[in-house]
Amino acid sequence: MCSSDLDDEVIAHYKEVAKVGIPIVAYNNPFDTKVDLTPKLVSRIADEVPEVVAIKEFSGDVRRIWQIKRLAPRIEVIVGADDVLLELATAGISGWIAGFPNALPKESMELYHLATSGNFKEAAPMYAALHDLFHWDSKKEFIQAIKLGMDHVGRYGGPTRLPRLPLPAHEQAQIHREMDYALAYFKNR
């Protein structure tokens, strides 16, 4: 099968970046970049660019980790979206580049450690309590949502810089409700 011109451009990009001589974490965010690092392309990157050691997977497709592990077993997978942490942890992950731990660091790290140690029975209800909130990390308003979550718990998130505008009042209220729900879970468990 022939590779697409875009795939060749992606390979050329990583080869150029690799000239710096340090390990590279590829970032798959097809929503914002309009370039999808498919498992087949990740396999090709793994074969042709040894400096790429990991991928931050933000496609939202939880099936991909299994394909990446099969096609590019040397590439470590890092969770790139908060709302797929538990699903990807079932396949074994190497890390989590996350948003909402800025607002809820202790709770998020507890969840991460339970999930990565395979303690899914304890992790599942915790994840359920956080999931609606975590889903904001996969929306275009994620920066505003995380900052608002930080403000909610007394960690200064502050206003966003332009071009990001404050969230509409109904979305702010929703985030406050979701923060309250998550905090109540941790307080009452």
Language-model segments: residues:
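Flexible C-terminal active-site loop/helix
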Residues: 155-189
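Charged helix-capping and loop-helix junction motifs
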Residues: 7-15, 38-42
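Conserved short secondary-structure transition element at the edge of the structured enzyme core
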Residues: 89-92, 131-164
